[in-house]
Amino acid sequence: MPVITLPDGSQRQFENAVSVLDVAASIGAGLAKACIAGRVNGELVDACELIETDATLSIITAKDQEGLEILRHSCAHLLGHAIKQLWPQTKMAIGPVIDNGFYYDVDLDQMLTEEDIQALEARMLELAQKDYDVVKKTVSWQEARDVFESRSETYKVAILDENIARDDKPGLYHHEEYIDMCRGPHVPNMRFCHHFKLQKTSGAYWRGDAKNKMLQRIYGTAWADKKQLNAYLQRLEEAAKRDHRKIGKQLDLYHMQEEAPGMVFWHNDGWIIFRELETFIRQKLREYDYEEVKGPFMMDRVLWERSGHWDKYADAMFTTSSENREYAIKPMNCPGHVQIFNQGLKSYRDLPLRMAEFGSCHRNEPSGSLHGLMRVRGFTQDDAHIFCAENQIQDEVSACIRMVYDTYSTFGFKNIAVKLSTRPEKRIGSDEMWDRAEEALSAALKHNNIEFDLQPGEGAFYGPKIEFTLHDCLDRAWQCGTVQLDFALPGRLGATYVGEDNDRHVPVMIHRAILGSMERFIGILTEETAGYFPLWLAPLQAVVMNITDNQADYVKEVVNTLNESGIRAKADLRNEKIGFKIREHTLKRVPYMLVCGDKEMEAGEIAVRTRRGVDLGKFKVTDLVEQLRKEISTRVLNVVEE
């Protein structure tokens, strides 16, 4: 007679073993209809799962994040059902849930076209609207293997052979004549899977190994209702308009090319943004009392072996050789900073020592993962390392947190998710040391009134860490900032300081990044602003235009005044209609367009118009200079009308 305890603390007793769905039905018909799965004693299970002993139970519906993920996983199975009907020779590989959707890797002789994807989506909808029950059968390993071998599903057989223990009991999910294998749970009925959209295809190697066969990966999104689906598709449409690759080309910021994959060719205007960002971060470094250093791009393999990077990152490092010595181009700055710390005897009075670098790093990312500025091989880290004593950790981390929030607020990022990752099973150092370190990070977050999620066991083997994830205007997540304690690297590379007791001690090292990669952050900013950069970052801050040749000299005078005042301005003296010039510079997102006619010239004024089309009226040139300089120096987010 199992007693089921519900989330509100109420209890229900049943005569016999009872399914999750039965419990939902005992509460109400509406809940039974909405029930996708259950969480029994903390574990997600199918709605058909029998509960035989006393247990806690939460009913999972499509309103829950877990319910949405289950629904998406079932849509992957639905894709398999449909593709096997349209192309029976297809071999199914894996079909997991991803952010906002799912994908399935399939082995199919023909390349799927756009028309094929449309036909596949139509068949999926046709099947889903039959509202058939999904039937789960738990079988032996051998039974599962026999099922898939009889259907020539070689990838499923390989998964069984290589990934599933012989004494395991795989779950087979029956979608009418189609069978798929999964841990589950899945929806009990396909009425939950009506709102989806297939999005794109790409290539993907089986097992992610380039030595294996290239499969076709079909991506889709799925939601609980039509409203959510349409809202997501609208966000995607807006994201496409904001794509930094498209805007970067339109505004002539940078380009990439095949001869240097993952390396950025910065054009003049893009490089202006880069340097302004660098100047801003340098200002923060001065405010927070950092030294700025510059380490070499390339160091001997021996050093990377001592640091431990060679064992863990060798595949991601570019290497070269000279005079019988092997070198690696640095993928990160930290070993170089320890070398700088090691020059000269350090005392406890020298700590904390805060060392920052705009380090040019390179990582041999797979070519298929490269994506504009967001995923590159050559990048610049706004990296810093703080060498401190253990009793200084909390104060230093607290200062790092303030610096992170201070920086992000300048760009208008207010929705910041924070995670604290604690000790993993395999780690160095004593439990007492980890206790103190984790408490220091937690206390620093609490001291700054920062809410955070705990991620037990997710820290690095050498120390706990804090991660800062930005959410942009489209609610996309970008993990940028990190504060990571390191108890290992200083000792491995021989870093010590003399303590108050006159003994040698190994400093704690705090790895700290705010923007992460300068390139990636510029990509994020480009998409966040849709190319409407704040005035201080805009490559061209004002363009001055004449109406007739009569004002040409006056325009040049205005431009000179602006430039001498530190405002990036250019003249447009082309023999074109003023409306044409304004439209062209509006498309270039120039913040201010200044128009000079005879009246303005005679009055020593300028007519001011913004890139959003707002007429701000006429200004004395000196007054306009004062206003623009104020906007630039205070780094306001938007020009006046925005």
From Swiss-Prot:
Residues 243-534 are annotated as: Catalytic. It catalyses: tRNA(Thr) + L-threonine + ATP = L-threonyl-tRNA(Thr) + AMP + diphosphate + H(+). Pfam families: HGTP_anticodon (PF03129), TGS (PF02824), tRNA-synt_2b (PF00587), tRNA_SAD (PF07973). GO terms for biological process: threonyl-tRNA aminoacylation. Its main location: cytoplasm. Its cofactor is Zn(2+). GO terms for molecular function: ATP binding; metal ion binding; threonine-tRNA ligase activity; tRNA binding. Residues 1-61 form the TGS domain. GO terms for cellular component: cytosol. It is an enzyme of class 6 (ligase). It is found in: Cytoplasm. PANTHER family: THREONINE--TRNA LIGASE, CHLOROPLASTIC_MITOCHONDRIAL 2 (PTHR11451:SF44), THREONINE-TRNA LIGASE (PTHR11451). Catalyzes the attachment of threonine to tRNA(Thr) in a two-step reaction: L-threonine is first activated by ATP to form Thr-AMP and then transferred to the acceptor end of tRNA(Thr). Also edits incorrectly charged L-seryl-tRNA(Thr). Belongs to the class-II aminoacyl-tRNA synthetase family. This is Threonine--tRNA ligase.
